A protein has these predicted regions:
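Early transmembrane hairpin of solute transport permeases
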Residues: 6-116
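Interfacial/capping segments of alpha-helical transmembrane domains
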Residues: 28-32, 146-152
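Alpha-helical transmembrane segments
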Residues: 55-67, 121-136
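Membrane-water interface of transmembrane alpha-helices
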Residues: 69-82, 131-149
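Membrane-water interface at loop-to-transmembrane-helix junctions
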Residues: 93-98, 152-169
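A membrane-topology feature that recognizes alpha-helical transmembrane segments
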Residues: 106-112, 127-130, 134, 141
Length: 169
């Protein structure tokens, strides 16, 4: 079975949780959850449920961080926050639309992750999910320069030997 309804529901709420915690902090929480489960396993506790519910759904970075990242990008269009400030909790917005975008981001992150795992793509499925949702957030909600033109001056000024060297390495 490709998708699990319980995982979709958990991803929905994980998205909201990630937005309330803050994107960067979700990685810290993921580490603590992993450490807790490891310690419980070490002392003989059956952690099957904790692994399935917490590690593989609620605190899976491609779900919880995706959600926080997408919600932050959206909040950047409506509130006093830049769309790249994933280290901040979005609780200050008091905006149900931000929570809805985060829930959608969590579900989308899960669906991409589950799809890739179902077909056993030889990639880091979590990373691909984060990249795809991040690009989607950039396309939908970007209000800043996509790139810094000053940093691309070397393209016009570079000599042929520079490009030859770049090609060789």
């Amino acid at each position: 079975k490709m998708f699990s309804l319980s995982s979709i529901i958990l991803a929905f709420f994980a998205g909201i949780l990630g937005t309330l915690i803050g994107g960067t902090q979700t990685f810290i929480c993921t580490g603590f959850v992993g450490l807790l489960i490891f310690l419980l396993e070490h002392v003989g506790v059956n952690t099957t449920f904790l692994n399935e519910a917490l590690s593989n759904n609620l605190f899976l970075p491609c779900i919880i961080f995706n959600a926080a990242g997408l919600a932050t990008a959206y909040a950047g269009t409506k509130h006093e926050i830049r769309g790249v400030e994933t280290s901040r909790s979005l609780a200050f917005t008091n905006d149900p639309k931000v929570l809805l975008v985060s829930a959608i981001g969590g579900v989308l992150g899960y669906l991409i992750f589950a799809f890739e795992n179902y077909f056993s793509f030889p990639v880091d499925t979590g990373a691909v999910s984060v990249i795809l949702v991040g690009v989607l957030g950039r396309i939908l909600f970007n209000q800043e320069d996509t790139y810094n033109e000053k940093n691309l001056d070397f393209l016009e000024k570079a000599s042929p030997s520079f490009w030859g060297f770049q090609f060789l390495i």
